[in-house]
């Protein structure tokens, strides 16, 4: 029987952790607001719309299932079933499909956004104690598994970047197409906001953020204008920043490469949420948690993320035999093999159905050796 989370009287993770008797809900030391989703939030958030995807159509859903399926069909002699970590739970679209297609699967869903956890918790309630939801960034995967009493996992999925659901919540400040507070926090309990960065960081630091995280070629020019503008009046809304960006970026450049605010907003969002630092820590942690035969699928939407994923995958698929030796040394074979040929792209049919999939780069590996059996 499905659980009615909107009427439940206990926090969602306590209910969801029934499958893992040693697990409990605790505040993560990585995120100040980490912990349980309060079920009262579910009714408030889920009453907004009847759309289960909340505007976020799962990207490359069939391909993700196809790639992870070989790792999720095992049954151990001790009776334990396969475990999948959805490291970017969002509205729960990918997770729902996996739980439906693999009836014995146990799922651990991670997200730092309590609104996302509330929405996904309501959506996944029919799967009962097969589901564990944890409020944490994806680099908290090791702690989340420890709290759930899970040593090794069979699959892990990352769908990186900001979700359509978050973009559509205009008050969050992620979108440059609507006026809203200059916020951009994926975790609303986090302290750092885009407004604080724009209003307090010096020109040199702002330039570095815009250049390194947004690949903005006018980073220095924009940073200088920000510093001069805020001396008269601090920035408080997205529209104020967008107006400055139109002034800072030369007209010929504004006519190419998409919206002139796109790169600056990306850079600020990445800085506010420490997205790249989190990803650099999360990928090795996820790889270490996989048992032999386990698989990882990562979908990235911009070059900075994909570069990190590509480098991490390249490292673990390389031989550990010292160069120059004529043969592979026993025990020095690669721990992982690629199950995609480089990065896969969405085809025209997928992009037509879901335009958000246009920039996606999907990479996948399988663990073939090493520790973790």
Curated annotation (Swiss-Prot):
Organism of origin: Mycolicibacterium smegmatis (strain ATCC 700084 / mc(2)155) (Mycobacterium smegmatis)
Compositionally biased residues, Basic and acidic residues: 343-355, 363-373
Gene Ontology terms describing biological process: rRNA base methylation
EC number: 2.1.1.199
GO molecular function annotation: rRNA (cytosine-N4-)-methyltransferase activity
Annotated NCBIfam families: 16S rRNA (cytosine(1402)-N(4))-methyltransferase RsmH
Binding site for S-adenosyl-L-methionine: 92-94, 111, 138, 159, 166
Gene giving rise to this polypeptide: rsmH
Role noted for this protein: Specifically methylates the N4 position of cytidine in position 1402 (C1402) of 16S rRNA.
Region annotated Disordered, chain positions: 343-373
Name the UniProt record assigns to this protein: Ribosomal RNA small subunit methyltransferase H
